[in-house]
C-alpha cells in the first residue's frame, strides 16, 4: 500500500513536469509572423532562420525535459528500493527503519571534462620515481667503512684545477618547540640566549652568517626585547648575515599532519615576519622531521619558495642517491602533468644534521671540527679524538684534514658548490660557543683561501647563499636546455636511520592527541569562517560589543597553539610526558576559547535584528552540545533540559561547502520529545538510550537523533521541546551473549538467548552481517546485490626480544600480529531505529561499534566505525584493527599524504614488517579490477596491508622502554582514546590491474572525498543557553553564508581574517583558500545524491557569498607573502586540478 502511494505521488510529479515543460516549450515556441499581408507561396528568409532557431531551442528543451524525467525516474527507483528494504519484523534480522529520501534532491553528475585529469595522470616521465627506487635498492646494509652506511669515497687531486671547490659553511641552531622540556622552559633556559648572543656576535664581523627557522621562538623573544635589539636584527637581515629559513611557526612533522594545519602554521609564521621584520623566506629547511612528504614540497613551492633542504631519509636511499649523484633534484608532484610544481631540493647525505655528520663521510674527523667539544667542555667526541683549537702551528694540517672531508663529500654531488651545515640542537646558547666556532673557522677559512694550490673558496653563508651559488654554477654548465639535476617524484617514508630501525611507531604514538588535533582543526576552521563573516556584519551594523571583543586575539592564540602542535615532536607523540600535557593543555584551552568565538559569531549571524546583539564575556549565548572537562578526557555530550512550555533553540552549523543532509544527535532529559524544523514542522526523531555502562540505561538522559538538511556553510534553527504528542520513535535493543541483567527502562530490550539467527543490520544501500561476537563478517551492496566477505578483526603486536625494542619513534615487532583473544564471549548490543542502526561489541580493551544511517545520499553509503580503545593495563603491546576481504590487491595499497594526495604503496617481502607501515592522515585503500575498499579516518594513524585483501590500522601502542632516540622514556601515558572511521566499498568499472601497477598516482572517488569531509567536519549543534536574552530578540530560521553549493570538487580550506599591519588587531581583508580535488570517475556513483556539480574549476566570486558583497578579490601566493606580477582585482577563479590557491578578499 505504501509503495503504490509513493509511486502515485511521483507519477503525478512526472506528469506535472511533462505538462509544464510542454507548456513552456509551446509558449517559448510561439512565432511572431509579419503583420502585413502574406504573399501566397512565399516566406521571408529571415523568418526561416528564426523558425530554425526556435526548432533547435525546442529540441534542447526536450532534451532537458528528458533529463529531468530520467532523474525523477531514478529517484522513484531508489524510493521503491528503500520501501522494499523496510522493516522485516523478526528481532534477529535487520529492521532498517525508514530510508529517508531527500526532498527535491537529484543526483547530479560530474562534467566528463573533470574526469580527464585523473585518466591522464600516471603516464608522465620522471627521471627518478621513488616506487621504482625501492625495487632497485637491495637493502642489504653492508659495512661501508668510516661512512658505515655508505661507501669509500675517492678523488683525484687535480679535479678542482679548472673550477675550485666553493664551500658554504652554514651555522644554525635547531630549537625544538618542546621535546624534553616544554616550549616555555626551552625558551627560558636556552633559546632567548641564542638570540641575545646572535645579535652581539654577528655584529662583530660582517662575514659571519646564521640561519633561523622556528618563528614561534622568534615571536616570543621579540615580545620581550627593546627597540635597539629589534633594529639590530633588522640590520642583520638586510645585510644578509641572518636568514630566516622556511619561516613557519614550527618545523612541522610531515607524516601525521593535515595540510590545513601545515598551511595555517606557514601563514602564521610568514604573516608575523611580514609585519615585524618585512622579510620573505625563500629557502626551506627541514632537518629533523622523520621522513619527508611531497605535500610540504608543494606548499613551499606555492608559497613562493625556490629551493629546500631535507635530512631524515632512509639510509639506503641516501646511499643509492649518493652513488647516482642524485642528492640534488627537482622534486615534482606525482600528479603534475608538466613541471609547474618543480622545486630544487638538497638531500643531506649522512646520518645526522649534527657537526660530526655534516662536513664529510668520516664522523671521527668531522667531530674534531666541532669546537664546542674542545677538551675541558661538557661535551666530547664519542670517537675518542677531541678537537684542537686552531693556531698558526696547526692550521695547515687541520685545514688539509677538513678540506679532505669537504672534497669527499662534494664527490656525491654534480657541481663544485658544497654545503656544510654547522650546528646541532640548541647550539650557540652560550656566548663562548660563538667565539669558539666562529674564530676557529675564521682561521681555517683564512688559511684555505690564501693557498691557491688548494683550489678552494670557503666562507660562512646562509642557505640561500648556497642555493644562489649553486644555481649560478648550474647556469654556467647548462647546455642545450638539459637540466643538471633530475626530476624526482614520490615521498620519503618510511624512514630508517640504521639497521631495521624503522620510524613507523610515531605514526600512531599518543593517538588521543592526534584525534584532538583533528577536532581542533575543524573547530578553528569553523571559528575563522564564522568570525570573519560576523565581523563584516558587526562593521556594517556598527555593533561595538562584537568589534571590541578580544575574539581576534583569542583566534590568533588558537592558531599559534595549533601551529605549535604541528611540531615534529608534538603531533608525533614523541615528547616527554609533561611536555605532552603542556601541548594538550594548550589545545584544550584553545578549543574552549574557540567555542566562545563560534557561539558569539553564530549568534550574531542568526539574529534577525543585528543591532540587538548582546554578549556575556563569561559565556556564550550559544554553547556547544559537547564538553571536554580536561585536556586528557574524552568529550561528553551535554544534557539539554527540556520543558513543555518553552522550546529550547538548537542552532546547527554545516561546516561543509555543499548543501548537506546529515544526522544531528543531541542529549535531552526527556524521552517524550518533539523537534521542530525551521518551518515549524515536526521532524522524525529517533530516541535512543544513553548508557551508564554496557547494560544500564540512564533514566535522566536520552539521545535524540534527527535528519537535518542544511545549506552550504549555513546555520539553521531547530526547536526542541517536551511533548506527549511527539513523533519520536524509540530505538529497540537486542542483546547477545548477555550473562547479566540489563535495565531496559522505557525501551524494548530483548535477550537473544540461543538464537541461531545471524546478526544483520541494513539500509537502502548495504546489508551487513556479523558473527556472534559482534564483529562484521560480510557485506551486500544492494547496487549489484552481491555479497562479499568483509571481516573486522583485532590484533596485538608485541615487541622484539632483542636489545633495541619499540618505543615512541620505532616499531620493532616480535613477528606477525596475533589475533585478539577475548577472555569470554563478548557482550553484543544491537540497536535498531528509524534514523540509524548499529552493532556494538564489548571487548576488554575495545568497545567497537559499526553503524548504518538510514539516509539516502552520502552518509548512507558507508559504514561508520567507532572504537573506544583502552590499553592502559597492557605492557609492550600495540593494538590493530584489520579489515579483510577477497579483494586481490596484489601487494599494492594506497595511503594518503596529509589529507592532500594519494601515494601508492607496495608490501615488499625484502623489507621487514615494520617498513611496510606508512602514515595515514585521512584514508587508505586497496583495490582490484572490480572493487575498491577504503578506510576513511578522522585521525592520523599508521596503516598497512600485510596480506592480500587486508587493510590494517594501528589504534594505540603502550611501550615500557625508550627506543634510544633521545626521548629517554617509553610511551605509557595512554588515555581512553576514541578512534573514528568510515568503511566504503565501491565498484570499479572496467579497470586494468596492470595499469594500476604501473601508475604512480591514484585518486579517491568523489564519494570518498565527500565521505572524508563529512567525517572530519561533522555538523556542529549549538544550544541557546536558557532563554533569549531579551523578548525583543528573534532568530532567523536559517542563515546562508554561501549563495549556493560550491562545485563538488572544490573545498573551501579556510576564510582567515588577515592581521592588521599595525597593532594586534585585524585588517579588512581575509585569506580565501580554495582547493580543487581530483577524483577517479571509474568508480560507481549511482544515486550518490550529491547536491552539487563540477565546473572545471571555475567559480564566480561575486556570486559566492550570500548577504555579503565582494569589494575586491586579488590572487596571492599560498601564504600571502607574494602577489603575482599581474595580480589585479578579478571576478572569477579558475583552479587547475589538485591546486590550492589563496586570494585576498574584502567583503562588505
UniProtKB/Swiss-Prot annotation:
SUBUNIT field: Homodimer; disulfide-linked.
Topology feature Lumenal, residues: 27-1148
Region listing for Disordered, in residue ranges: 1121-1148
GO terms, molecular function: alpha-mannosidase activity; carbohydrate binding; hydrolase activity; hydrolase activity, hydrolyzing N-glycosyl compounds; identical protein binding; mannosidase activity; mannosyl-oligosaccharide 1,3-1,6-alpha-mannosidase activity; protein homodimerization activity
Positions with a binding annotation for Zn(2+): 174, 176, 288, 568
InterPro entries with a match to the protein in the record: Gal_mutarotase_sf_dom (IPR011013), Glyco_hydro/deAcase_b/a-brl (IPR011330), Glyco_hydro_38_C (IPR011682), Glyco_hydro_38_cen (IPR015341), Glyco_hydro_38_cen_sf (IPR037094), Glyco_hydro_38_N (IPR000602), Glyco_hydro_38_N_sf (IPR027291), Glyco_hydro_57/38_cen_sf (IPR028995)
Protein name: Alpha-mannosidase 2
Enzyme active site: 288 (nucleophile)
Alphabetical list of Pfam families matching this protein: Alpha-mann_mid, Glyco_hydro_38C, Glyco_hydro_38N, Laman-like_dom
Residues glycosylated per entry: 93
Similarity comment: Belongs to the glycosyl hydrolase 38 family.
Regulation: Inhibited by swainsonine.
Cellular localization per UniProt: Golgi apparatus membrane
Residue numbers on the Cytoplasmic membrane side: 1-5
Organism: Rattus norvegicus
Any one GO cellular component localisation term in the record: cis-Golgi network
Amino acid at each position: 500500500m505504501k509503495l503504490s502511494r509513493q509511486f502515485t505521488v511521483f507519477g503525478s510529479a512526472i506528469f506535472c513536469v511533462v505538462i509544464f515543460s510542454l507548456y513552456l516549450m509551446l509558449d517559448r515556441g510561439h512565432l511572431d509572423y509579419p503583420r502585413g499581408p502574406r504573399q501566397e507561396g512565399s516566406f521571408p528568409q529571415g523568418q526561416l532562420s528564426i523558425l530554425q532557431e526556435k526548432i533547435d531551442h525546442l529540441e534542447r528543451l526536450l532534451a532537458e525535459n528528458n533529463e529531468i524525467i530520467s532523474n525523477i525516474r531514478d529517484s522513484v527507483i531508489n524510493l521503491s528500493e528503500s520501501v522494499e528494504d523496510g522493516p522485516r519484523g523478526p528481532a534477529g534480522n535487520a529492521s532498517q527503519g525508514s530510508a529517508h529520501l531527500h526532498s527535491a534532491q537529484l543526483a547530479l553528475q560530474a562534467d566528463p571534462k573533470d574526469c580527464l585529469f585523473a585518466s591522464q595522470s600516471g603516464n608522465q616521465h620522471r627521471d627518478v620515481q621513488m616506487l621504482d627506487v625501492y625495487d632497485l635498492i637491495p637493502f642489504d646494509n653492508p659495512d661501508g667503512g668510516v661512512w658505515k652506511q655508505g661507501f669509500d669515497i675517492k678523488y683525484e687531486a687535480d679535479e678542482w684545477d679548472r673550477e675550485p671547490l666553493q664551500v658554504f659553511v652554514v651555522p644554525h641552531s635547531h630549537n625544538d618547540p618542546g621535546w624534553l622540556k616544554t616550549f616555555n622552559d626551552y625558551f627560558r633556559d636556552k633559546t632567548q640566549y641564542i638570540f641575545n648572543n646572535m645579535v652581539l656576535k654577528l655584529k662583530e664581523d660582517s662575514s659571519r652568517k646564521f640561519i633561523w627557522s622556528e618563528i614561534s621562538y622568534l615571536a616570543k623573544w621579540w615580545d620581550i626585547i627593546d627597540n635597539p635589539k629589534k633594529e639590530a636584527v633588522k640590520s642583520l637581515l638586510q645585510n644578509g648575515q641572518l636568514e630566516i629559513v622556511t619561516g613557519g611557526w614550527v618545523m612541522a612533522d610531515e607524516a601525521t599532519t593535515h595540510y590545513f594545519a601545515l598551511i595555517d602554521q606557514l601563514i602564521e609564521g610568514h604573516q608575523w615576519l611580514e609585519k615585524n621584520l618585512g622579510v620573505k623566506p625563500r629557502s626551506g629547511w627541514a632537518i629533523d622531521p622523520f621522513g619527508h612528504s611531497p605535500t610540504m614540497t608543494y606548499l613551499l613551492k606555492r608559497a613562493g619558495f625556490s629551493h629546500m633542504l631535507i635530512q631524515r631519509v632512509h639510509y639506503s636511499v641516501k646511499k643509492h642517491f649518493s652513488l647516482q649523484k642524485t642528492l640534488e633534484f627537482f622534486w615534482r608532484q606525482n600528479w603534475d602533468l608538466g613541471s609547474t610544481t618543480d622545486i630544487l631540493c638538497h638531500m643531506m647525505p649522512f646520518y645526522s644534521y649534527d657537526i660530526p655528520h655534516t662536513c664529510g663521510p668520516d664522523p671521527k674527523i668531522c667531530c674534531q671540527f666541532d669546537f664546542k667539544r674542545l677538551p675541558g667542555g661538557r661535551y666530547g667526541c664519542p670517537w675518542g679524538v677531541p678537537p684542537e683549537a686552531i693556531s698558526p702551528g696547526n692550521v695547515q694540517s687541520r685545514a688539509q684534514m677538513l678540506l679532505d672531508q669537504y672534497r669527499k663529500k662534494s664527490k656525491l654531488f654534480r657541481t663544485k658548490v658544497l654545503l656544510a651545515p654547522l650546528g646541532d640542537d640548541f647550539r650557540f646558547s652560550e656566548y663562548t660557543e660563538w667565539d669558539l666556532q666562529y674564530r676557529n673557522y675564521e682561521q681555517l677559512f683564512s688559511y684555505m683561501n690564501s693557498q691557491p694550490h688548494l683550489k678552494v673558496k670557503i666562507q660562512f653563508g646562509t642557505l640561500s647563499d648556497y642555493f644562489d651559488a649553486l644555481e649560478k654554477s648550474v647556469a654556467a654548465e647548462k647546455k642545450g636546455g638539459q637540466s643538471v639535476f633530475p626530476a624526482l617524484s614520490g615521498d620519503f617514508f618510511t624512514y630508517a636511520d640504521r639497521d631495521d630501525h624503522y620510524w613507523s611507531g610515531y605514526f600512531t604514538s599518543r593517538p588521543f592527541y592526534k584525534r584532538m588535533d583533528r577536532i581542533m582543526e575543524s573547530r578553528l576552521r569553523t571559528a575563522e569562517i564564522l568570525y570573519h563573516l560576523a565581523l563584516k556584519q558587526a562593521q556594517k551594523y556598527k555593533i561595538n560589543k562584537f568589534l571590541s571583543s578580544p575574539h581576534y586575539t583569542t583566534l590568533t592564540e588558537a592558531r599559534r597553539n595549533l601551529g605549535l602542535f604541528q611540531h615534529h615532536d608534538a603531533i608525533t607523540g614523541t615528547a616527554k610526558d609533561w611536555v605532552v600535557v603542556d601541548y594538550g593543555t594548550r589545545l584544550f584551552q584553545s578549543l574552549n576559547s574557540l567555542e566562545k568565538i563560534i557561539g558569539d559569531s553564530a549568534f550574531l549571524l542568526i539574529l534577525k535584528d543585528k543591532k540587538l546583539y548582546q554578549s556575556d564575556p563569561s559565556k556564550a549565548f550559544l554553547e556547544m552540545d559537547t564538553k571536554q572537562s580536561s585536556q586528557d578526557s574524552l568529550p561528553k555530550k551535554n544534557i539539554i533540559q527540556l520543558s513543555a512550555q518553552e522550546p529550547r533553540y538548537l542552532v546547527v552549523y554545516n561546516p561543509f561547502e555543499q548543501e548537506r543532509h546529515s544526522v544531528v544527535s543531541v542529549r535531552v532529559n526527556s524521552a517524550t520529545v518533539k523537534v521542530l524544523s525551521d518551518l515549524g514542522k515536526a521532524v522524525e526523531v529517533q530516541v535512543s538510550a544513553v548508557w551508564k555502562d554496557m547494560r544500564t540505561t540512564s533514566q535522566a538522559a536520552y539521545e535524540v537523533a534527527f535528519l537535518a538538511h542544511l545549506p552550504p556553510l549555513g546555520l539553521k534553527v531547530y526547536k526542541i521541546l517536551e511533548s506527549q504528542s511527539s513523533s519520536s520513535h524509540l530505538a529497540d535493543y537486542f542483546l547477545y551473549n548477555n550473562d547479566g541483567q540489563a535495565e531496559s527502562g522505557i525501551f524494548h530490550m530483548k535477550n537473544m538467548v540461543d538464537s541461531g539467527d545471524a546478526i544483520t543490520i541494513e539500509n537502502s544501500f548495504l546489508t551487513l552481517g556479523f558473527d556472534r561476537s559482534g564483529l562484521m563478517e560480510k557485506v551486500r551492496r544492494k547496487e549489484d546485490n552481491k555479497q562479499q566477505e568483509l571481516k573486522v578483526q583485532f590484533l596485538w603486536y608485541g615487541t622484539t626480544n632483542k636489545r633495541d625494542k619499540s618505543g615512541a619513534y620505532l616499531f620493532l615487532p616480535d613477528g606477525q600480529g596475533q589475533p585478539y583473544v577475548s577472555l569470554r564471549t563478548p557482550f553484543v548490543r544491537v540497536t535498531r531505529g528509524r534514523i540509524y542502526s548499529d552493532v556494538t561489541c564489548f571487548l576488554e580493551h575495545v568497545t567497537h561499534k559499526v553503524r548504518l544511517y538510514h539516509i539516502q545520499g552520502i552518509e548512507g553509503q558507508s559504514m561508520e566505525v567507532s572504537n573506544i580503545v583502552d590499553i592502559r593495563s597492557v605492557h609492550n603491546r600495540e593494538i590493530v584493527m584489520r579489515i579483510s576481504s577477497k579483494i586481490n590487491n596484489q601487494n599494492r595499497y594506497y595511503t594518503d599524504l596529509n589529507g592532500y594526495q594519494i601515494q601508492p604503496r607496495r608490501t615488499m617481502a625484502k623489507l621487514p614488517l615494520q617498513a611496510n607501515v606508512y602514515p595515514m592522515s585521512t584514508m587508505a585503500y586497496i583495490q582490484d579490477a572490480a572493487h575498491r575498499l577504503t578506510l576513511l579516518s578522522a585521525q592520523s594513524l599508521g596503516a598497512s596491508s600485510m596480506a592480500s585483501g587486508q587493510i590494517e590500522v594501528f589504534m594505540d601502542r603502550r611501550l615500557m622502554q625508550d627506543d634510544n632516540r633521545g626521548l629517554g622514556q617509553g610511551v605509557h601515558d595512554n588515555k581512553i582514546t576514541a578512534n573514528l572511521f568510515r568503511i566504503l566499498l565501491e565498484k570499479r568499472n572496467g579497470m586494468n590491474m596492470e595499469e594500476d601497477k604501473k601508475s604512480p598516482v591514484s585518486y579517491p572517488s568523489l564519494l570518498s572525498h565527500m565521505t572524508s569531509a563529512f567525517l572530519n567536519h561533522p555538523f556542529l549543534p549549538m544550544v541557546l543557553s536558557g532563554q533569549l536574552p531579551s523578548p525583543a530578540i528573534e532568530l532567523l530560521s536559517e542563515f546562508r553564508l554561501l549563495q549556493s553549493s560550491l562545485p563538488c570538487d572544490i573545498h573551501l580550506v579556510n576564510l582567515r581574517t588577515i592581521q592588521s599591519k599595525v597593532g594586534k588587531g585585524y585588517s579588512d581583508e581575509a585569506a580565501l583558500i580554495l582547493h580543487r580535488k581530483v577524483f577517479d570517475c571509474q568508480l560507481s556513483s549511482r544515486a550518490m545524491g550529491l547536491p552539487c556539480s563540477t565546473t572545471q574549476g571555475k567559480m564566480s566570486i561575486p556570486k559566492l557569498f550570500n548577504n555579503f558583497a565582494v569589494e575586491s578579490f586579488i590572487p596571492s601566493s599560498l601564504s600571502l607573502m607574494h602577489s603575482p606580477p599581474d595580480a589585479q582585482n578579478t571576478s572569477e577563479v579558475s583552479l587547475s586540478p589538485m591546486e590550492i590557491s589563496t586570494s585576498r578578499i574584502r567583503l562588505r
